[in-house]
Amino acid sequence: TAWERMGQEGGIQLVLPSLLDELSVLEAGPVDRATTEFPFALSAGERRDYTANTIYRDFGWRRKDPDGSLRISPDDAADIGLETGDQARITTAVGSAVARVEVTDRMMPGHVSIPNGFGLDNEDGTRSGVAPNELTSLGDCDKFAGTPHHKFVPARIEAVA
């Protein structure tokens, strides 16, 4: 019975000894991956209400944000000299792209984001927004799961004249 499985510890033991060695590669806590060269945490591939599935290909769904803007906090935007509608260069260790800026208090200082689903070529030959995969690296990934660190890509943000 479940009661018998609780044993002397007084609860069900969820420790799987076969996984303990594998879990040792995980970090003990949050890791600040920012550097002086790349001081921002870029969330590359943020889900927004108009990027679900493939609806972002329909311009009607993204009238307010046709190119998947770079979201940045008011404090950071002021420090860099950016305002909503300006262009900013996003640079990471593996790539660089230019995005339209949206200044919003929904972002914490030190954090910026771009949505998923952009950077694709349109039928008319134009490209809308930034492709998050062009700013991320397969070599920079979680040691346990092997997935790229899309939610904290060290980045630099600069105003484009």
State where each predicted segment sits:
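Long, contiguous, secondary-structure-rich segments that constitute the structural scaffold
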Residues: 1, 5-6, 58-71, 75-161
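Long, low-complexity segments enriched in small/aliphatic residues
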Residues: 1-60
